[in-house]
């Protein structure tokens, strides 16, 4: 059974490796990732994972995995920080407060059946000093990341509390992914 990873994220590739899985092909789906007007974060991240999966061609003998992660402050979706100004804004929003990190994974089995699961985790950061935000931005590790930070990097030192899936916060919830792969017939130990 062959596996296709529909993602260019090095974190998703690393996380699949933790399951002992190496994709046979990696393809980055090209879709519009803009939220729809009034779309809730939960609906958005599920739709993104499903659209990414549907955007990649798959052979009959292939299982496909796609995922998406978003950070939500209330109903507000914080996508990938495009530049330092946006990252600063995101970090100011999550400073000292709880926020949700939602990670959806969609697996399409060899028979074409798609299954999707959602992991919803909560993270609380300390209240940031302006100098801490600037120092973090200078590391570059949060650039292009949902919410403007990477939990697996130096941002982890700012976490005062979290609940949920650490791998989901990183970008691919392993529990949900493992179960979806097994239900799709992918051989896991």
Show where each model-derived region lies:
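N-terminal beta1-alpha1 ligand-phosphate binding loop
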Residues: 1-21
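Anionic-ligand binding patches
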Residues: 2-4, 40-189
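Cofactor-binding loop segments of dinucleotide-utilizing enzymes, especially the Rossmann-like FAD-
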Residues: 8, 29, 110
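Surface-exposed, flexible loop/turn segments at secondary-structure boundaries
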Residues: 11, 32-34, 113
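A short beta-strand-loop structural module common to alpha/beta enzyme folds
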Residues: 23-34
